[in-house]
From Swiss-Prot:
Keyword Zinc-finger part of the UniProt annotation: no
Cellular component terms (Gene Ontology): extracellular region; immunoglobulin complex
Extra remark beyond the main annotation: This chain was isolated from a myeloma protein that binds galactan.
InterPro entries, sorted: Ig-like_dom, Ig-like_dom_sf, Ig-like_fold, Ig_sub, Ig_V-set, IgHV
Protein name as annotated: Ig heavy chain V region J539
Lineage: superkingdom: Eukaryota
One record GO biological process: immunoglobulin mediated immune response
PANTHER family the record matches: IMMUNOGLOBULIN HEAVY CHAIN
GO molecular function: antigen binding
Record keywords: Adaptive immunity, Immunity, Immunoglobulin
SUPFAM superfamilies: Immunoglobulin
PROSITE patterns for the chain: IG_LIKE (PS50835)
Length: 119
């Protein structure tokens, strides 16, 4: 059974940093592209980016590539999202996903909530 479990979310101040993690199990993690997707309150899904199985290629949504860094550790079956210079509009539920590729099914985690607030 494919499982994706995100962690690391929480409250962060504007301008701050946060690193999200995703633990994968139930499939050969090292063979798949992996993605991060987010959903802000009351808005649709927004694709953040994706990383090649060997980390050789990382693609980002252009507006986010200067503040988010996607990485992975195949030995630990883990995917990461380093967030920096966060703003209120980065408040969202962040999902780790193995999206559709070459006929394979898509799988999503439950998400981890990031709230950007000075309070």
């Amino acid at each position: 059974e494919v499982k994706l479990l995100e962690s690391g979310g929480g409250l962060v101040q504007p301008g701050g940093s946060l690193k999200l993690s995703c633990a994968a199990s139930g499939f050969d993690f090292s063979k798949y592209w992996m993605s991060w997707v987010r959903q802000a309150p009351g808005k649709g899904l927004e694709w953040i980016g994706e990383i090649h199985p060997d980390s050789g290629t990382i693609n980002y949504t252009p507006s986010l590539k200067d503040k988010f860094i996607i990485s992975r550790d195949n030995a630990k079956n883990s995917l990461y999202l380093q967030m920096s210079k966060v703003r209120s509009e980065d408040t969202a539920l962040y999902y780790c996903a193995r999206l559709h590729y070459y006929g394979y099914n898509a799988y999503w985690g439950q998400g981890t909530l990031v709230t950007v607030s000075a309070e």
